[in-house]
Amino acid sequence: PWGDKMDRNYVWYGGNSGHTHHPVGTRKPNPWGLYDMLGGVWEWVSDWYGEFYYKNSPINNPKGPSNILSWHVIRGGSWIDDKQFVRTTIRYPGLADNTDDYWVGFRCARDLN
């Protein structure tokens, strides 16, 4: 929401976090009223990670592989990362059974329809 220059009022990252996590909602919301869309913790999303995942998957409700040990995507960067890693378009793989990283979390979401 801040253009080409990061506005520290909206995000926790390695440059302003004091190298620790912070309560949700302590930064300003984005223009859509959503808090902590970047920084804070990396967030698990339901997308599966693969080199060609977006190219080869259906647009609506892709199922992903049936293997529980398949890679999922984490997004958004965290309070330990440099600012170049704190953006919505960045994605990294994470194993679905590896949940012990204290800089990775998840976001609850629901369909508005």
Where are these regions (language model features)?
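Short, structured beta-strand segments at or near domain termini in extracellular proteins/domains
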Residues: D100-N113
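Functional-site microenvironments in short loops/helix caps that host divalent-cation chemistry
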Residues: P1-R91, T99-Y102
